């Protein structure tokens, strides 16, 4: 319900504004304005139809509806940003006129030109975004870890975060992620939260757990909760994650081998999750300690407890500009490498790769 409320607020705030400005820009002809009106009516109707009947509709139908509505939702954000820039330009003209005379004399043509520039620009941006999502790449970062790891002088980890398996991210893309992971020949794979998006049925019905079982890592596959694991069908998500072949770490401490510790924290959204201090009782702090924590809020806590490396996801680096700028105001480190005292952190947007040594790490 929370997701729906957020989406419908955006629908009811952005769509009327876009419609109003677009309608003004179009020529006063039925052949232009009627299709424009129908587009907005159909999109909003499709959105409500998909939400109301989401549990009754076949998966392929609801997936199609989500593709259409999600694409328009993202496009509407960029259209709105473009229109707001134009509003500022119009305001500056009112304060101190500076538009050339030819523009004033052809104001309707100018608005129509800007209309098509925004449409084509946002369309190109959406095509680029789709290509980026559907063609994931591996991010490699080098990190130095000071502690010795016994007889082990190398450890390769693949970290995947924020898969958001659901209506949009499905079986084909997960198979790409698995193939990318196996191509790195990792010692260990970690799935750092938000494995599912909202409903669990899409992962269940497509048997995506069978694809995740194909992840190859001699030290195992480890999974932690993200905030999306607490949205809708929580128990079903827990049962499904247990079928993936990985080890689910919910406030748990394991030693994949005797040379280092791996601590998987429950998500920050669960206010009753255990403190890191309590989880580390009995942990030999002379060995490397790696903590998986979906949301990057606990840097100070990790630093105080002697953690060597914190691995996080969640932020998507804002994902859509200008959100990355806002993320920098919200998080101490919204993306990439960060060091606080002796503790090092990496916040991933999707796919990351680590190789640890006595004196170094490759992430």
In which residue ranges do the predicted regions lie?
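Extended active-site neighborhood of metal-dependent phosphoesterases/phosphodiesterases
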Residues: 128-130, 135, 139-145, 149, ...
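Membrane-embedded segments
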Residues: 134-137, 148-235
């Amino acid at each position: 319900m929370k997701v729906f409320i957020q989406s419908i607020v955006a629908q009811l705030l952005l769509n009327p504004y876009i419609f109003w400005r677009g309608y003004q820009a179009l020529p006063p002809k039925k052949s232009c304005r009627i299709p424009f009106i129908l587009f907005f009516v159909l999109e909003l109707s499709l959105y409500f139809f998909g939400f109301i009947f989401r549990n009754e509709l076949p998966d392929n139908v609801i997936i199609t509806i989500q593709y259409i509505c999600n694409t328009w939702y993202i496009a509407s954000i960029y259209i709105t940003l473009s229109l707001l820039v134009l509003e500022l330009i119009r305001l500056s003209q009112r304060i101190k006129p500076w538009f050339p005379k030819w523009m004033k004399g052809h104001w309707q043509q100018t608005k129509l030109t800007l209309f098509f520039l925004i449409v084509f620009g946002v369309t190109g941006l959406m095509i680029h975004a789709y290509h980026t999502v559907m063609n994931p790449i591996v991010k490699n970062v080098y990190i130095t870890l000071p502690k010795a790891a016994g007889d082990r002088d190398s450890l390769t980890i693949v970290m995947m975060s924020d898969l958001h398996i659901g209506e949009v991210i499905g079986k084909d893309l997960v198979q790409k992620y698995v193939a990318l992971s196996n191509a790195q020949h990792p010692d260990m794979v970690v799935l750092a939260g938000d494995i599912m998006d909202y409903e669990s049925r899409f992962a269940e019905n497509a048997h995506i757990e069978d694809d995740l079982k194909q992840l190859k890592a001699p030290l195992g596959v480890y999974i932690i909760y993200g905030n999306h694991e607490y949205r809708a069908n929580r128990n079903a998500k827990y049962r499904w994650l247990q079928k993936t072949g990985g080890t689910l770490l919910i406030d748990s401490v394991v030693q994949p081998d005797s040379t280092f510790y791996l601590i998987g924290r429950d998500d920050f959204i669960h206010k009753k999750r255990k403190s890191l201090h309590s989880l580390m009782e009995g942990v030999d702090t002379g060995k490397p300690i790696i903590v998986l924590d979906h949301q990057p809020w606990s840097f100070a806590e990790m630093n105080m407890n002697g953690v060597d490396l914190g691995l996080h996801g969640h932020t998507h680096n804002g994902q859509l500009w200008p959100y990355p700028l806002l993320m920098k105001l919200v998080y101490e480190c919204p993306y990439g490498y960060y060091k606080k005292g002796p503790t090092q952190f990496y916040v991933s947007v999707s796919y990351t790769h680590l190789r640890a040594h006595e004196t170094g790490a490759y992430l």
